[in-house]
Amino acid sequence: ENDADGSTPPTVEKIGSKIKSKAPCMVLFCAFEQLHYYIELGERYGFKHYIPLVFRKNFSAQVLKANMKIVGNCEYGLVLYKDKLPKFNNDGQMIFNCFDWVRDTKDVPKIHPTQKPIALLERLIEIFTDRGDVVIDPCAGSGSTLLAAAQCGRNAYGFEIKKDFYREATEKVLNNIQPSLF
């Protein structure tokens, strides 16, 4: 997750060059304007291919501009992968690169300003990993990726440098699983 202040941790540089599995992929969320930057950065670290993702919301954060212009209701992302297509669990169904963004229910605490819905994260984890695989979230923020991975039967490791987010995620979201959150 990007930090609320707009800074983006060096995900691709730090983790991308260390991935050794046969067909790894990296899924990242970003702003539309960042897509090209992350494609180029991925290529620099061996992720030669990508699949663009669009996450369609039924709401917009730009509500104050609704009477002045068309407002955005999408978030964007990329699936970066090396030489081989990543693992792909589609159960024989066509999967489009545009996903509906369904908000979490009120029982999932909102901890981070860029927190992603658990159901969306579960869907992506189920598509690109198998039970028992490892999911890494280098910007764990709310802990939602770790929770989604655990609920899908995956092992997960998360890293968070902001102590307040770590504490809240540990207390409110991850209290029923055994996370490796640093």
Across the structure, where does each feature detected by a protein language model lie?
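Class I S-adenosyl-L-methionine-dependent methyltransferase module
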Residues: 174-182
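Core catalytic lobe of class I
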Residues: 1-158, 162-166
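Conserved SAM-binding loop
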Residues: 169-170
